[in-house]
Design a protein with these regions (language model features):
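Conserved alpha/beta-hydrolase catalytic His-Asp/Glu region
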Residues: 93-97, 109-164
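Conserved alpha/beta-hydrolase "acid-adjacent" motif
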Residues: 181-186
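Flexible "cap/lid" loop of the alpha/beta hydrolase fold
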Residues: 72, 78-109
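Conserved acidic catalytic loop of the alpha/beta-hydrolase fold
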Residues: 41-55
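Catalytic histidine-centered segment of alpha/beta-hydrolase-like enzymes
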Residues: 205-214
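Short beta-strand/loop motif that positions the catalytic acidic residue
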Residues: 168, 174-176
């Protein structure tokens, strides 16, 4: 089974069109908010344990960070993985503490000022070269879980993963948008460390690679999992 992990302020249904594009539709996207009461390590172990027929793990942004944690756990049975626009972590404790405070502020706004929260989220510079993700379903009822995801899965709580990436021996496809400069740099460093990594850079594409360039993303994933 091919497992798709959604991004922050995302929804498992965001992956529906990509799952439908897989031959035999052999894929699913779990609701990651079921795990927000746990830290990244524990969440990763649970996801691994719930996928005995593990084939391909696909993760975008926050889901990509969770995917990397899954691959580094000793109960991982994944055969291959696709990492899209993912961060490998902050190096210094100062950076981590700043990020934790920032994510706690996001969490507070998600609970208390939802409309303001969404507006500020979409106006971030990271999305300036990306499209909105079109949804016919609401994230509003997930706001408490979204807040918890900022608190428990903050990038500030994540250890810096680059020193551990050489332990991931399975094939990795790392996808990033050429306009997403910070994550382009992260992807380049990560793929130099990973023993079996192919890096694909999509032209004229920002952070939200799957939704900025859905046809190329689906083609890349399907070619990789064959």
């Amino acid at each position: 089974m091919n497992c798709f992990l959604h991004g922050a302020v995302g929804h498992h249904k965001d992956w529906a069109n990509f799952i439908n594009s897989i031959p035999d539709k052999n894929g699913f996207a779990p609701n990651l908010y079921k795990y927000v009461n746990y830290d990244l390590k524990r969440s990763a172990r649970i996801i691994n344990s719930q996928n005995p027929d593990a084939q391909t793990l696909i993760g975008y942004s926050m889901g990509g960070r969770i995917a990397l944690h899954c691959l580094l756990e000793d109960n991982s049975n994944w055969k291959r993985a696709v990492i899209i626009s993912a961060h490998t972590g902050l190096v210094s404790e100062k950076e981590q503490q700043i990020r934790i405070k920032k994510d706690n502020d996001w969490a507070s706004n998600a609970i208390n000022k939802w409309d303001t929260f969404i507006s500020k989220w979409e106006k971030q510079s990271i999305f300036k070269n990306s499209h909105l993700i079109e949804r016919n379903y609401s994230l509003y009822h997930q706001r408490a879980n979204i807040a918890l995801s900022f608190q428990n899965w903050s990038l500030g709580h994540q250890k810096f993963l680059e020193p551990y990436l050489d332990k991931i021996r399975i094939p990795i496809l790392w996808i990033v948008g050429e306009l997403d400069l910070k994550f382009l740099e992260i992807a380049g460093r990560a793929c130099k460390i990973l023993p079996n990594c192919d890096l694909i850079k999509f032209k004229s594409t920002g952070h939200r690679v799957p939704w900025d360039n859905p046809s190329l993303t689906a083609k890349a994933i399907n070619s990789f999992i064959k």
